[in-house]
Amino acid sequence: MNFELTSAYKPTGDQPEAIAQLTEGVLEGVPAQTLLGVTGSGKTFTIANVIANINKPTLILSHNKTLAAQLYSEFKGFFPNNAVEYYVSYYDYYQPEAYLPSSDTYIEKDLAINDEIDKLRLAATSALLSGRKDVVVVSSVSCIYGMGNPSDFYNNVIEIERGRTINRNVFLRRLVDSLYMRNDIELNRGNFRVKGDTVDIYLAYSDNLLRVTFWGDEIDGIEEVDPVSGVTIAPFEAYKIYPANLFMTTKEATLRAIHEIEDDLTKQVAYFESIGKEYEAKRLYERVTYDMEMIRELGHCSGIENYSRYFDGRAAGTRPYCLLDFFPDDFLIVIDESHVSVPQIRAMYGGDRARKINLVEYGFRLPAAMDNRPLKFEEFESMAKQVIYVSATPADYELVQSEGIVVEQVIRPTGLLDPVIEVRPSLNQIDDLMEEIQIRIEKEERILVTTLTKRMAEELTEYLLNNNVRCNYIHSDVDTLERVKIMDDLRQGVYDVLIGVNLLREGLDLPEVSLVAILDADKEGFLRSHRSLTQTAGRAARNVNGMVIMYADKITDSMRLTIDETNRRREKQLAYNEEHGITPQQIKKARNLSVFGNGAETEDTQKGTRAYVEPSSPNIAADPVVQYMSKTQLEKSMERTRKLMQEAAKKLEFIEAAQYRDELLKMEDLMKEKWPG
């Protein structure tokens, strides 16, 4: 089946040329291309058109779950008749196993799995193994983490068709081998029930039941039914039932794995004893022996993933299987926000290894645990045959990979221009800034000011407050959740000015901001590099009156690059608007935009056509089922939510952290209501 792009939007601005260039590059086998697209230029729509043109399975890689969810929603809208899947970590909460030698502290693994995401992950792998070409998988960096052998997964697919002869009990055993569990009382995802000649299977990767009806030893009927009403959704002549778990194995493989594990245990214990680590030897022997007993009796144990190398039949040091192994050879990878995503992919292996070294050296795990890991960056590169890097500020790596050839997309369908950039002397910069602030306040617009240090941010805030300017500051010492409120207050008009040290985060993508002031712009460094200055200047790119003022005593190379590039883009945007009679339109950003919305749209009133632009920002809302929890369960859920909130805040994912905060407050209110006092 081919991709079928469904959209009321038409490519405009730079989009047609970008689509043509990228499509040609992929079809000609170019290994790497870079799409340099400014914020709001409709990069997602461009990529959707490229996918439809090349008709290849595609992996869209995003650097966090929130953006992945937004992309998933958008691509579902573009390809409603094709397989658009979502593959991210299925943990709502995850505390990895770790050991801290300095304090002799062992931290046990703790987790909470999101059943819905688990279903979506299975749907993604099932779609890839179905053989269809029209598959788009939107993924986070989870795609490079270890999972089951795709061959084992595929070998456990059950193919049935009407009229085929198969004994019912044999069929039931096949279901059990595919890790479906029989439950005739309560049917949940991954279960099946038997009523006479009818077998109902709650597919692990779907919201529907599969009903298989037998007539003796012959399959008489196959149909998908609604699990609640029992109404038939669709009949089938043939059907493939995919396994209920990504990690498949056989009894023979399990016995072989146990034998190999016990052999390696003997060697590692002997090694510890030879270097005088009797305590570590004893600890390792007891832990692994207990795990083997659990696997023999129950088929699994806590931390079984640390033995994955044995179950997969891999040699020591070889890479694990991952989502990329489920794709055919001729697939395309699109790396969104590549300047962030590529370094993240590069860092995953090192972080995982650093944690596991202590577990191995102190006798908590066998050395084979090191092979349950994400891909090394070199391994990822070897599997990525064709890549499109997408970024407003591509890094040197992407430019080198694409041999300096960049496909530009700088025209916005809204007609908005890149902001005007002015350089002013740092002498009397605060007085000059005060004048500019007053001009914006009169127009009910907002201002961002970026400084080099926390102390400067605080002192400038105090000065502006003393001059009756409504303002606040954010930096790493400000409570992370308080930052969310401060930014929301800026949008609401509680503050007119927000001052910070690093204002590059997506949480500060604010259309109300018409002025960005960069103090000490000539101080070269991380916060004043070319890419940082470009990203900072981009904060004003969503406002019709967008302007950037750099206060400096000299123009550095980074400043010159940023100014020249912005002016070049602006000239191109102006020329396009004049040629096509387009008037720039201010973006109206919804305050509670759901990630499952299908984007924003703009209408060219002069021509009556619509064009697609990216939504201004994603926003995930948690919706847990807590009404019927016991007090203990609710307390545990609150603690997990608190940890998730703190983790999101540490990553400066402000919107996500705010949602967890709201969820936590609701649970606290529920706790007080159900158990007062």
Swiss-Prot record:
Record-linked Gene3D superfamilies: P-loop containing nucleotide triphosphate hydrolases (3.40.50.300), UVR domain (4.10.860.10)
Keywords: ATP-binding, Cytoplasm, DNA damage, DNA excision, DNA repair, Excision nuclease, Nucleotide-binding, SOS response
Domain Helicase C-terminal span(s) in chain numbering: 429-591
Primary location: cytoplasm
PROSITE patterns: HELICASE_ATP_BIND_1, HELICASE_CTER, UVR
GO biological process, any: nucleotide-excision repair
A GO term for molecular function: ATP hydrolysis activity
Residues covered by the UVR domain: 635-670
Pfam families (alphabetical): Helicase_C (PF00271), ResIII (PF04851), UvrB (PF12344), UvrB_inter (PF17757)
Keyword Transcription listed: no
Subcellular location field: Cytoplasm
One term under GO cellular component: excinuclease repair complex
Residues annotated as domain Helicase ATP-binding: 24-412
CDD domains attached to this UniProt entry: DEXHc_UvrB, SF2_C_UvrB
Binding-site residues, ATP: 37-44
Protein family (similarity comment): Belongs to the UvrB family.
NCBIfam families in the cross-refs: PRK05298.1, uvrb
Functional description taken from the UniProt entry: The UvrABC repair system catalyzes the recognition and processing of DNA lesions. A damage recognition complex composed of 2 UvrA and 2 UvrB subunits scans DNA for abnormalities. Upon binding of the UvrA(2)B(2) complex to a putative damaged site, the DNA wraps around one UvrB monomer. DNA wrap is dependent on ATP binding by UvrB and probably causes local melting of the DNA helix, facilitating insertion of UvrB beta-hairpin between the DNA strands. Then UvrB probes one DNA strand for the presence of a lesion.
The protein's name: UvrABC system protein B
Source organism per UniProt: Bacteroides fragilis (strain YCH46)
Lineage start: Bacteria, Pseudomonadati, Bacteroidota, Bacteroidia, Bacteroidales
Gene: uvrB
